[in-house]
């Protein structure tokens, strides 16, 4: 009976299945969020974590393409440093339990935490509203792709030594570019809906809400 389900889909078939699952998860989480009361920021953070983990696992066949960096960047912008670090660390650990856990998980947690901190520090510049462009956010997301990858590259110091670190980083630039291109796509796709969701669940409801929350949570 089990063999009857063992269909050989090939790499593109599996990718299509994974993308379908990711969109189903995203739609279900969006519907769930619509039923939440306002200022449910902790629950929203949990839902974002589910989507980030799912996206990283399901998109793993595509090298260095995942929604995690953009999600954590935006969580830093809207929810502050502390919660973005919680999200960064949890996503790194939980997703790596499925795709491979090791010392690099610590560096990934550091890298994504730094992305969240960058979002919090520049929150007043990156906060989206109905009239603002997402171009500044896109530029920062590109920058964060390289920052994250280079932080994770530091993990090779435990095996290769400092003399080969620069060579290792240079060899990884094509993958860094893929990460940056992926971030451009995810900003274009996710920035507006995530901004709307996060703004709706901010704990402070006034024009400087984002700035005040970030200041209070650093």
Regions found by a protein language model. Name each.
Residues 53-66, 89-123:
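Interfacial aromatic-anchored transmembrane helix boundaries in multi-pass membrane proteins
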Residues 44, 73, 87-88, 92, ...:
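Alpha-helical transmembrane segments of multi-pass membrane proteins, especially transporters
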Residues 68-84, 118:
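Generic transmembrane alpha-helix motif of multi-pass integral membrane proteins
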Residues 37-45, 80-84, 137, 194:
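Membrane-interfacial loop-to-transmembrane alpha-helix junctions, especially the N-terminal start
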Residues 1-74:
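Hydrophobic transmembrane alpha-helices
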Residues 23-35, 78-79, 118-127, 192-199:
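Structural signal for the C-terminal ends of transmembrane alpha-helices
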Residues 1-18, 105-107, 125-214, 218:
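Membrane-embedded alpha-helical hairpins and interfacial helices in multi-pass inner-membrane proteins
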Residues 2-4, 49-57, 90-101, 141-151:
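Aromatic-anchored segments of alpha-helical transmembrane domains
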